[in-house]
A protein has these predicted regions:
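Serine-esterase "nucleophile elbow" of acetyl-processing enzymes
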Residues: 1-46, 50-56
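Alpha-helical cap/lid subdomain in secreted, periplasmic
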Residues: 2, 52-191
Length: 191
């Protein structure tokens, strides 16, 4: 029996908890036994924690949707902690750049004056490889995905062009793009 684990960020989370929409993760859950632990706005560290919260041996397949390399984990986001979709949100520069909330001023200053891109990319790559190695140990067939314009240190599929050209209101992409991602993921599962 095919059992699929989905972990990742908002490109894989269930947006129907807040909005009347269905995205590719919902389509996938309609056809397979799926455990979707993805959390909107989360860092790569929290994606690793999603994996740590389950026994990988229970799954035949894992889909990991990787986030931006510049997300900084926080225990409680001052703006989103009670939001049904964004309650696990971490900091990212684009979110704090134009926000007037006084509590984010120091975060904006950190990104602008102190953020060490090479360090955060290095830590990000270590976490991605750790996730991949754990799933390999359990012989879980693994699909790594990103919607961001960067290369992962593991074999992956990049849907950044789809995101750039087909933005929408379910998992950041329109219905056509969600169907396209679903079709590709379904094909990978059945191969």
């Amino acid at each position: 029996m095919t059992k699929v684990l989905v972990i990742g960020d908002s490109f894989a989370s269930d947006w129907s908890v807040k909005y009347p929409v269905s995205g590719w993760p919902n389509f996938l859950a309609n056809e397979f036994t799926v455990t979707n632990l993805a959390q909107s706005g989360c860092s790569e560290y929290k994606i690793k924690k999603q994996l740590d919260s389950v026994n990988p041996a229970q799954y035949t397949h894992a889909i990991i949707v990787h986030t931006s390399k510049s997300r900084i984990p926080v225990e409680i986001h001052p703006l989103h902690n009670s939001d049904a979709l964004l309650h696990s949100c971490d900091f990212i520069y684009s979110d704090v750049l134009d926000n007037n909330y006084s509590g984010l001023k120091c975060i904006k200053e950190f990104y602008e004056k102190f953020y060490h891109e090479d360090f955060f990319e290095y830590i990000y790559d270590l976490i991605v490889c750790d996730i991949d190695n754990i799933l390999l140990q359990y012989n879980v067939l693994t699909l790594h995905i990103t919607f961001f314009d960067h290369v992962l240190p593991v074999n992956h599929r990049n849907f950044n062009a789809l995101f750039q050209n087909c933005q929408g209101n379910a998992n950041h992409i329109n219905e056509h793009a969600n169907r396209e991602v679903f079709t590709e993921v379904k094909s990978w599962i059945k191969s």
